[in-house]
Amino acid sequence: CPVENSIYMSQHRFDVLLRKLEKVKEKAKYMKADDLHGLLTCHEADAMVLCCEMQLRAASMRKESRGWFIREDYPDMDNENWLKWIIVQNKEGEMTFHTERVPVEEYDVQPPKY
């Protein structure tokens, strides 16, 4: 696996992947289906591209490392600023992102303090 596709993330890698994804989205506009099975495959491909974009943009938004989520440019866990959920929504056809505080007091298991 090339290092640029490893589990280690950085803003530069996110930007490169998002540019590649834009090219895929452009090509996907020209998909065609000859039958119902092909149409289903086209819809699945569109859904995969959408999921990939949501995941990349949300990951790019998180400016910390946490558990398996390892960012080279933000190597430390930051509970003060990033003990949050990232919420992705469709608002009037646009992908939007915001964060919500994780209500840790409601859970028996607490995040580590570093």
Identify the role of each PLM range.
Residues 1-114:
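Glycine- and aromatic-enriched mobile tails/lids
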